[in-house]
Amino acid sequence: MRRLRPVELDFARSAPLRLTFSARLGAPPSAVYAALAEDAEGWARWFTGVAEAVPTDGGAGREVRLTGGTRFLETVLATEAETRYTYRVDRTNAPGLRALLEDWRLAPDGDGTRLRWTFAADGPGPLRLVLLLARPGLGRAFRVSARALDRRLARAANGS
């Protein structure tokens, strides 16, 4: 795996490519945050394309494997209970990436949660173009994943 450029939280605003998606979930921010930040293994059960996610370094990082074989070693940069979960990719086998950070923001929305995902990346021009063209697919994957997470959290809240 290749090492990527280490970026910090401000990369979510300054990255050459930023894709942001949002969805409303019926679960409260506390439940959504717990699924994002405290249940790494659970991601494979609701996030489209994630085959496996395991915490590393006592929860300070994660190792993620996608269904197509892409792998990421991540460092968690921000864990703000019920409001933010952010990580950067330190190493990957994905070609072309120079830097990647994902920023998840949560806000109360009535009795549910407004979830916003920012995918912030840097790479050569052709890679950025491919990612821009992939925006509709990433958006669809996010919406499908958000609905799957919402169903999962509703089942947990109902004890089933």
Name each region found by the language model.
Residues 1-4, 121-160:
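A conserved amphipathic terminal alpha-helix motif
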Residues 96-103:
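Amphipathic hydrophobic-ligand
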Residues 1-57:
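Hydrophobic ligand-binding cavity/cleft-lining segments
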Residues 78, 104-110:
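Short, low-complexity Ser/Thr-rich regulatory SLiMs
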Residues 90-94, 118-125:
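Short, solvent-exposed aromatic-acidic interface loops
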Residues 24, 41-95, 114, 147-160:
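Glycine-rich portal/gate segments that line the openings of hydrophobic small-molecule binding cavities
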